[in-house]
UniProtKB/Swiss-Prot annotation:
Pfam family, one: tRNA_U5-meth_tr
GO MF entries: rRNA binding; tRNA (uracil(54)-C5)-methyltransferase activity, S-adenosyl methionine-dependent; tRNA binding
Record gene name: trmA
Stated name of the protein: tRNA/tmRNA (uracil-C(5))-methyltransferase
Residues given in the record as S-adenosyl-L-methionine binding sites: Q185, Y213, N218, E234, D294
Length: 361
């Protein structure tokens, strides 16, 4: 189910999501959820478009689900950031005026930030050479953006291969590198609200935090300021490198980051086997009071769920309330919901982001 873009119906759609979250969490005696709304338009900081040839020209195109041969041509995209909407016609004019930029271009990706940074990735069905690089450099300068060209097995970077975001959490501004191609939260305004909620929910602690699925350090940076130490895990090499840069950039020095899956971490904590990636890290020295999880849509697998059960507090951000409810059902005999929230990351769709703080009974 997906609703049409209609700002006048936003409140009704949000009410329906709140009702759905209440319904899913009711069996667990959840308190009333805090609700964090979204800007009604221009909230999405990244967008990806295929290009479609019509009347001898390439146009931005999107496709309805299951209709990959029926393009919807667009000139603007009201849910995308104002910066993306300003860049779209200028980029289109550039590829239409330049054979070098337009030839066999099939996809364009925009990444922008609340801090005003922007990056454009242009994907081609042909090799890219110095002639392309010359024109792309002129384009990047004219638009004030970084430009990345991608073709099979090759990537050319004009400027930087990341965008810089700055987010204010409880009066402190954190700076984030967002690498090209890596996951970032698409709705920057709601992401900032999410970070503030998590910061408040964890509280000021004298013990340590274990974070699973830390990504580029989106939550790691502010949460690290609330605890003694953090051990964070992530399996994506790109995200790990971004997180390490972000920790350094923000002078956050109480975090150790390791490339382990949740399953491997469970084995390490249970002393099933040693891991070379944990060399120099004494797991027994940590006094974990809270585990923070932000899993993919499938939620936590049963073994990871059992891993979280051993912690006094579980702070859980979910992009799928159904799998969140299933995980809580597995944990409800030992943990109860102390607070919960809905974050409207994805207006005009049925998708919702939610958060719960579970504490041991």
């Amino acid at each position: 189910m997906s609703a049409a873009f209609d700002p006048s119906s936003y409140a009704t759609q949000l009410d329906a999501k709140v009702a759905r979250l209440r319904e899913l969490l009711a069996p667990f005696g959840a308190p009333e959820p805090a609700v964090f709304d979204s800007p009604r338009e221009h909230y999405r900081l990244r967008a990806e478009f295929r290009l479609w040839r019509e009347d001898g020209q390439r146009h931005y195109a999107m496709f309805a689900p299951g209709e990959k041969h029926k393009a919807i041509l667009i000139d603007d995209f009201p849910i995308a950031s104002e910066r993306i909407n300003a860049l779209m016609p200028r980029l289109k004019a550039a590829w239409q005026a330049s054979e070098e930029l337009g030839n066999r271009l099939f996809q364009v990706e925009f990444l922008t930030t609340l801090a005003g940074d922007a990056m454009i990735t242009m994907c081609y069905h042909r090799p890219l050479d110095e002639a392309w690089e010359v024109e792309a450099r002129q384009l990047a300068e004219a638009l004030g953006v970084s430009v990345i060209g991608r073709s099979k097995g090759k990537r050319l970077v004009i400027g930087r291969d990341y965008a810089v975001e700055k987010l204010d959490v409880a009066g402190r501004v954190f700076s984030y590198r967002q690498p090209e191609g890596a996951f970032t939260q698409p709705n920057g305004a709601v992401n900032q609200k999410m970070l503030s909620w998590a910061f408040e929910a964890i509280g000021e602690r004298e013990d340590d935090l274990l974070e699973l699925y830390c990504g580029n350090g989106n939550f790691t940076l502010p949460l690290a300021t609330r605890v003694r130490q953090v051990l964070a895990t992530e399996i994506s090499k790109t995200s790990v490198n971004a997180a390490l840069s972000n920790l350094d950039e923000n002078a956050v020095d109480n975090v150790r980051l390791v490339r382990l899956s949740a399953e491997e971490l469970t084995q390490a904590l249970n002393e099933v086997r040693p891991f070379r990636r944990l060399e120099g890290i004494d797991l027994k020295s940590y006094q974990f009071g809270t585990v923070f999880v932000d899993p993919p849509r499938a939620g936590m697998d049963p073994d990871t769920c059992e891993l979280t059960r051993r912690f006094e507090r579980i702070l859980y951000i979910s992009c799928n309330p159904e799998t969140l409810a299933a995980n809580i059902a597995q944990l409800q005999d030992t943990h109860r919901i102390e607070r919960c929230a809905l974050f409207d990351q994805f207006p005009y769709t049925h998708h919702m982001e939610s958060g719960v703080l579970l504490v041991r009974r």
